[in-house]
Amino acid sequence: VISPIKEYEKRLAMAEIVDVPFHGKDLLHGNEGYATVSVGDRKRLLTQFARFVRTLPITYFVLQYDATDTHGRDELESKIRRDLASLVYDNLEFFQSFDTISVYYDNGQGAVSVALHDALDFVLAKNVADYRVADYSARRLLQVADYICTVERIAIAYEDGRQSKTHERFFGNRRTFLQSFRKQLLRKRFG
């Protein structure tokens, strides 16, 4: 039996697509590791990565905040802490079924980092969450998290009619995006 990761890597090799660690913003704009990858190959890479995500036994949830509704770091931190603690508490049996919960975060936003620690340590107990440094280039699941964030952000743009030409180039029109990317991902949503 081939693991989903090995299957993904095999499909890329067979299609002669370079295996660049997935990073949505860079893929869409041809930056960083995608600088020498053609638009066509970046589209094929996106399609293969979406297919890979569909095969994974994962679930995800989204905590989303609008800058107009959150005034300052303290308020953002408080909302994240409250919402995350509530989500974990409401699903405590599920979370307690694990001996350890590994939490990967790149510490990109201090408020998020503090809220993650506070909420999880409060609800689960201090020794359950295992905090690790996130390096998306070395971990496929972090790349999956980036893919999920990319699709979720772009879904908002399509819903508001603010999709860009770049979005349409990679994801198609609204209907195609909803069918090929959004709907597939929503099947993995937690709860």
Predicted regions and their residues:
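Phosphate-ester processing/binding pockets and catalytic centers
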Residues: 1-191
